[in-house]
């Protein structure tokens, strides 16, 4: 975290306790602005700073891309390996790796040299991408996705920490906003780039190999131009002692909780029935590890309050809780749109990967425009609660209109609906700027991590639940429709993988129309989750304080 200047606050006992905990109460208003002296400037300037920014932000762009790049190549990947039952893991695996590792890596950045930890995470990401690109089977690509996701989480946190350390307090809001914007742009460009590779002679494998090329180009900047940034909390202690400070009990329980719950969601209704004993066992394990994790954090088992994995002290601040919920709702709605708008066009219009991704452009353009407009106007107009309320209302309207889409809905109408949903994304990255204004300067990085946890967990759970809804409903619907028609379970699972399946093209016209009805109805049901996220977004916005940003 950046070296903070003196921070003052009223001497009321309640407020002093909040400051001691790194939190300011809602009544005290936002953290006072850190005044920047005229001689306070960045330690890195000029061309060197420009190159560092390009290299660091390129890593953030790659992280965003890899979150969603499989949205338009999953059909090609599943077709290559003829493994359709594990299709959901292509998207979920990356996000799972990110969520499991984001908490321990966040703590590691507080005690290890930021530069070398960042480079280590980049190397993990590149290694995982290499495994995905060269994967001989579906299991290998799933392992690669989880591995790359773990490294990607470290890349994202590294971006936030590097920006916080290397910029002045006055510059930080702008650069932190850029981190969120570039990540978001990467997420929505992922399907376009993935689709382009999947439809080209390069094949889907280059959707992963491209990461290695960019990493190779930027590596000299990371190694030779990025300054070494040892953390004060880790000074004077050996590598082993710093490792011991990490909350290993919390890390193991967090991993077990997330993995078992995602297995429960992804496998249920697809690999085996929801009531299967294996699925019930996974649910029980997830519940037990969740309770154990909460207890380990509350009682600081084999750790202390300073080093425990989850920053639980932020749960005492209602505004921070509301921002956490808002980040979660926004992340879930974003991933539903990015994954399922192209999927609709692949099925209904027979679009190629690149063409179906191009159909996202109305959503993309308004997403980017509203994020930029919000970042520029929100500090000028003040009361950020109004921006959040408007964003939530448009999220509900956009999701609700997407829910009404049928296989014969006009394309122009769908573009209009996606624009409404894009307008609802205006404040989905704003918490990265609002959150730090609510805490003392020495807790800024932790507040950003807190928001990132909400975003990452929602994307993981949202994507897993959406995949489970789509696959289970489509599978059961097509099984009922095509029963006795001579199609195997593998043929039907292949159809669910996307437009590359020949089953839909071979069906008689009337049967194809009914099959598309089943598929589109399943996609519509996925948007119910986005509607719920938007409704909760509006409710959570009402708990934000009516004060100026």
From Swiss-Prot:
Family matches, as SUPFAM superfamilies: MFS general substrate transporter
UniProt superkingdom: Eukaryota
Keyword DNA-binding included in the entry's annotation: no
Gene Ontology MF terms: transmembrane transporter activity
Residues covered by region (Disordered): 1-40
One GO biological process term: patulin biosynthetic process
GO cellular component terms, semicolon-separated: plasma membrane; vacuolar membrane
Localization, UniProt: Vacuole membrane; Cell membrane
Keywords, sorted A to Z: Cell membrane, Membrane, Transmembrane, Transmembrane helix, Transport, Vacuole
Signal peptide boundaries: none
Cell membrane is among the record's keywords: yes
Topology term for the membrane: Multi-pass membrane protein
Residues passing through the membrane, by range: 50-70, 85-105, 116-136, 146-166, 178-198, 206-226, 252-272, 282-302, 321-341, 360-380, 385-405, 419-439, 460-482, 526-546
Stretches with biased composition (Polar residues): 1-12
Main location as per UniProt: membrane
PANTHER family: MAJOR FACILITATOR SUPERFAMILY, MAJOR FACILITATOR SUPERFAMILY (MFS) PROFILE DOMAIN-CONTAINING PROTEIN-RELATED
Family: Belongs to the major facilitator superfamily. TCR/Tet family.
Role this protein plays: Efflux pump; part of the gene cluster that mediates the biosynthesis of patulin, an acetate-derived tetraketide mycotoxin produced by several fungal species that shows antimicrobial properties against several bacteria. May be involved in the secretion of E-ascladiol to be converted to patulin by the secreted patulin synthase patE.
Protein name as annotated: Efflux pump patC
